[in-house]
Amino acid sequence: MSLRVNFSSEQAFLAQYQKSDYPSPLMTVDMAIFSVDQGQLQILLIQRSNYPQKSYWALPGGFVDLEQDQNLMACAHRKLLEKTGIDSPYLEQVASIGNAKRDPRGWSVTVLYFALINFKAYQQQIQHSEHSEWVTLEQALKLDLAFDHHDLLQQAFARLNNKTRYTALPISLMPPLFTLTELQNIYEIILGHNLEKKAFRRRMIESGVVEETDQSKIAGKRPAQLYRFALQDYDFNFPRMLEYPRHHED
């Protein structure tokens, strides 16, 4: 039979409270950092330098530091910078995963984030990071990744794929000036299927997400109009999801 102790105040209760009296899970963050290069969707992986699962490829991440990290987002930015040399301006929480089997060290919880970053803008920092490397998503999903990172990667890609269908997030990969054909190509690489050209152009222009400039570039045999991003936030939501082309079959 347990004895209930009556405390005179919350302050008195907290004064005697010992966190070590209660078992706590391991607490980590993991990041799925996507980009596009050479016509393929890429994912940033790191090679683990310590046990457990030493030398396995994994998503960048690490333990929450109770002294340094004011919140989970701060931890995600800190670990990403430590492991890869980059600090993504955009990180979005995808899911929290916890169980007794995902980490051999014990009961573990991780908070999964994803980001979509410009490949060229961050490549120099990543090249100076000894254990990080860009891998195509197709290659990464064939690897025996550390812990449950194969499942985490699939969850993060599902979120990216879904957000591509209703937000302007892929425009963050574009240079300051671009053609609508170039932008459509980025969307198609992430989605994995073709889009109807007229519908895509109408969507981008009528929503006000892009605006014409007074410049053009030669594309094929004729000049193509150059556009720029017209909003402040890449997480702009379109009123409708992108539709599959008519010949697409599920």
From Swiss-Prot:
Residues 26-157 form the Nudix hydrolase domain. DNA binding is efficiently suppressed in the presence of ADP-ribose (ADPR) or phospho-ADPR. Accumulation of ADPR resulting from NAD degradation may be interpreted by the cell as a signal to activate recycling of nicotinamide. InterPro entries: NrtR_WHD, NUDIX_hydrolase-like_dom_sf, NUDIX_hydrolase_dom, WH-like_DNA-bd_sf, WH_DNA-bd_sf. Residues 164-237 are annotated as: Winged helix-like DNA-binding region. Disruption phenotype: Deletion of the gene leads to a 150-fold increase of the basal level of nadV expression. A motif (Nudix box) lies at residues 62-85. GO terms for molecular function: catalytic activity; DNA binding. The keyword Acyltransferase does not apply. Keywords: DNA-binding, Repressor, Transcription, Transcription regulation. It comes from the Bacteria. PANTHER family: ADP-RIBOSE PYROPHOSPHATASE, SLR1690 PROTEIN. Involved in the transcriptional regulation of the nondeamidating salvage pathway for production of NAD from nicotinamide. Represses expression of the prs-nadV-nrtR operon by binding to the DNA region located upstream of the operon, thus blocking the nondeamidating pathway. This is ADPR responsive transcriptional repressor NtrR. It comes from Acinetobacter baylyi (strain ATCC 33305 / BD413 / ADP1).
